[in-house]
UniProtKB/Swiss-Prot annotation:
Pathway: Pyrimidine metabolism; UMP biosynthesis via de novo pathway; UMP from orotate: step 1/2. Its EC number is 2.4.2.10. The lineage of its organism: Bacteria, Pseudomonadati, Pseudomonadota, Alphaproteobacteria, Rhodobacterales. It is an enzyme of class 2 (transferase). This is Orotate phosphoribosyltransferase. 5-phospho-alpha-D-ribose 1-diphosphate binds at R107, K108, K111, E133, D134, L135, T136, T137, D138, G139, G140, S141. The gene is pyrE. The keyword Metal-binding does not apply.
Length: 232
């Protein structure tokens, strides 16, 4: 069902953050940092995949996503909704249902047998495709999916995520340089504000998280494992 009312962006961000905290998708651990895919430490971790197990929250967030896309991209901006393997697939299906559009998904790499395709489902030349994922940190992983979509002759100028880290300034520029606009529901800053308001974490933890969010590179550099060759 296509939404007919448009809540303010700030309210969408606040409620999204609240839901993520409610289902304990947000983890803060400054004393024992998580390791990102890049190998760098982080005091924060978010598990958006948990959302598929909470129908009421899942449904509300997909309404928010549809509203965000209709308002910011347009009512007739897309012909096809593509999910990125694997976390983006369920959310792409839900967004496609909301907008009444076909759904496809993009593999990270070809299967290696059969059609050896990266696109599953029907995607045709000239279609305007929206790439849907659960989250993005620096935007890098989205570009491979976008390239696979464009190789079919379709266009992809937009990607939508539930959660955007919002702390690496190069992210938006990297996507824009590739001709892609990012749409998102909330960021770490929204989660931090809601965590403070709800008292979900203690003040010391939140202060350390804010230090990371304000200057992630410096925070990470100070906590990188020592290079053993430096002492030789």
């Amino acid at each position: 069902m296509i939404p007919t009312s448009f809540p303010p962006r700030e309210e969408i961000a606040r409620l999204t953050a609240r839901m993520l905290l409610e289902i304990e998708a947000v983890h803060f651990r400054p004393q024992e940092p998580f390791t990102l895919a890049s190998g760098l430490p982080s005091p924060t971790y978010i598990d958006c995949r948990k959302l598929i197990s909470y129908p009421r929250i899942r449904s509300t967030l997909m309404d928010f996503m549809a509203v965000t896309l209709l308002r910011d991209a347009g009512f007739e901006a897309f012909d096809n909704i593509a999910g990125g393997e694997t976390a983006g697939i369920p959310f792409a299906a839900l967004v496609a249902e909301r907008l009444g559009l076909p759904m496809t998904y993009v593999r990270k790499k070809p299967k290696g047998y059969g059609r050896n395709a990266r696109i599953e489902g029907v995607m045709t030349e000239g279609q305007r495709v929206l790439l849907v994922e659960d989250l993005t940190t620096d935007g890098g992983s989205k570009l491979s999916f976008v390239d696979a979509i464009r190789e079919t002759g379709a266009s992809c100028a937009h990607t939508a995520v539930i959660f955007y880290y919002g702390i690496f300034p190069e992210t938006i520029g990297r996507l824009q340089a590739h001709g892609v606009t990012l749409h998102h529901l909330c960021t770490w800053w929204d989660v931090l504000a809601e965590a403070r308001a709800s008292g979900t974490f203690d003040a010391g933890t939140l202060a350390e998280v804010e230090s990371f969010l304000s200057n992630p590179r410096d925070w990470q550099d100070a906590r990188k494992p020592a290079d053993p060759t430096k002492s030789l």
